[in-house]
């Protein structure tokens, strides 16, 4: 069967649909045939074959595991074939192609999630044995596999699986920690001695994989990590290592120097900034960093100490600086945002699904702002009110920087609307300033018109009096005019929706505006193209 599988896999990689479609159909028919996955294993483990054929084989194997490896899966793989494959998959860790090595590691991890340790108790001991060995490439592949296996096992949340993972952690943590320490030390010594980058790469890659393994073990493998001697030793060492690495980083003056200059500021560590801000958010929101009740009633001394440390760090001065920095630096629309507005305003208006705070800097900073504002409202309310007073007056339409600052402040005020209920006289602000800003029609001022629509929508359910709602409806109808910028019109729609969804909404108040609103919405519906917008 191997020769036939190789031929069909080769056809499945063709650019000719007349060749591709029949090959895909044949592979689909073979998915449930006995011996198919053994044949796929034979193909991708044969280093003499073309990489693209081996790549197709491992992908089909991986997809087959998702569909047919479970015991109760329809047309599932037979147990004797699964046992054979489990043995063969961990018999050789010398895959020379990095991309295939990664796919193999993910494949083994998928099987481990179903079978380890009950049906595959030799997996972890085999990986540890290879890691202890002297074969450099096999050691790297085993570490890569161990990382993905630990990641897969850590994701299982049933109580029995959690206990099994805690047992696994107890058995391997000392070895993994010592091995990580060894490779990290080796990397730092090589780096300080000016060793060639190609030689440094090997210990660095292995140290990084071990660090990823340690992260999963420590986070998910201990009920109380602070009681583990290994965990506490790791935390002590990691801060020392971080300091050393940051000092050594200063010597990197060639390829990465540009990133640390003003010209390269846009390239500098955005992913790192996101990680740092998310760490701060996690500390602010963690139940382990604040007592359940009063500080004097908490029985856990670690919780009390963590709370005290948090309060000592977040002083009035520190909070003021953080809040001001978040709003006036990280909330600003960027040139890329403005370019997107010009080219694809619908995409700018649609909120990302999923969890954008994990990868998007603005989404991340907004959540950090909310977390810190909720926790320290008594301090930060006055800071934000001061920013409002500083930026609430109309600005010159030609002064783009002032417009962007005003937009950022209004964004913060909208996000913190509920926390500012007693601090802001929104009716007065609406009547004297906000409605007037909607009348400024310069191109740059579309930024403010859009933000004002959004801001009023956020406050409509918080503190917009009933007597002002008719005027609000009229302003939003004007903002929906076909002559208005599309970004502003989409913000006006959202504002209207929030007001209509509010429990204080009265049908009779809105009836005079219903026909014109519906007509404008229908006109806009014909203009937009994105399904999310529609």
Q: Which sequence ranges carry the predicted segments?
A:
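Karyopherin-beta/Importin-beta family HEAT-repeat alpha-solenoid scaffold
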Residues: 1-534
């Amino acid at each position: 069967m191997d020769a036939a599988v190789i031929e069909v896999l080769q056809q499945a990689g063709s650019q000719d649909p007349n060749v591709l479609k029949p090959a895909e159909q044949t592979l689909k028919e073979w998915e449930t045939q006995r011996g198919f996955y053994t044949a796929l294993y034979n193909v991708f483990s044969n280093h003499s074959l073309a990489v693209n054929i081996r790549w197709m084989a491992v992908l089909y194997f991986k997809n087959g595991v998702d569909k047919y490896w479970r015991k109760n899966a329809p047309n599932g793989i037979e147990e004797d074939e699964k046992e054979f494959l489990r043995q063969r998959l961990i018999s050789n860790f010398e895959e020379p192609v990095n991309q295939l090595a990664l796919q193999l590691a993910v494949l083994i991890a998928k099987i481990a999630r179903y079978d380890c340790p009950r049906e595959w108790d030799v997996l972890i001991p085999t990986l540890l044995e290879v890691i202890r060995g002297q074969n450099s490439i096999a050691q790297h592949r085993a570490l890569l596999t161990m990382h993905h296996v630990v990641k897969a096992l850590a994701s299982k949340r049933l109580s029995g699986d959690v206990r099994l993972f805690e047992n696994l952690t107890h058995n391997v943590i000392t070895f993994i920690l010592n091995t990580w320490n060894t490779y990290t030390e080796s990397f730092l010594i090589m780096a300080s001695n000016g060793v060639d980058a190609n030689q440094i790469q090997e210990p660095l890659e292995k140290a990084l994989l071990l660090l990823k393994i340690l992260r999963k073990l420590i986070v998910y493998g201990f009920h109380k990590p602070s009681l583990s001697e290994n965990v506490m030793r790791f935390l002590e060492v990691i801060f020392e290592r971080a300091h050393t690495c940051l000092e050594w980083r200063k010597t990197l003056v060639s390829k990465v120097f540009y990133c640390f200059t003003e010209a390269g500021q846009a390239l500098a560590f955005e992913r790192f900034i996101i990680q740092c801000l998310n760490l701060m958010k996690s500390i602010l929101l963690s139940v382990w960093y604040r007592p359940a009740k009063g500080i004097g009633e908490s029985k856990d001394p670690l919780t009390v100490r963590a709370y005290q440390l948090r309060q000592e760090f977040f002083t009035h001065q520190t909070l003021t600086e953080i809040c001001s920095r978040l709003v006036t630096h990280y909330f600003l629309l960027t040139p890329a945002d403005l370019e997107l507005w010009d080219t694809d305003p619908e995409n700018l208006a649609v909120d990302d699904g999923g969890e954008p705070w994990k990868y998007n800097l603005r989404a991340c900073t907004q959540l950090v702002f909310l977390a810190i504002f909720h926790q320290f409202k008594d301090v930060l309310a006055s800071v934000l009110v001061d920013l409002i007073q500083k930026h609430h007056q109309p600005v010159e339409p030609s002064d783009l920087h002032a417009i962007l600052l005003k937009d950022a402040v209004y964004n913060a005020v909208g996000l913190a609307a509920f926390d500012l209920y007693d601090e802001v006289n929104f009716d007065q602000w609406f009547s004297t300033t906000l409605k007037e800003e909607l009348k400024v029609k310069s191109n740059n001022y579309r930024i403010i018109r859009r933000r004002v629509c959004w801001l009023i929508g956020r406050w409509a359910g918080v503190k917009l009096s009933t007597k002002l709602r008719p005027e609000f409806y009229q302003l939003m109808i004007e903002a929906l005019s076909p002559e208005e910028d599309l970004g502003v019109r989409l913000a006006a729609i959202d504002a209207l929706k929030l007001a209509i969804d509010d429990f204080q909404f009265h049908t009779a108040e809105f009836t005079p505006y219903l026909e014109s609103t519906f007509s404008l919405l229908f006109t806009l519906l014909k203009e937009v193209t994105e399904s999310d917008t529609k």
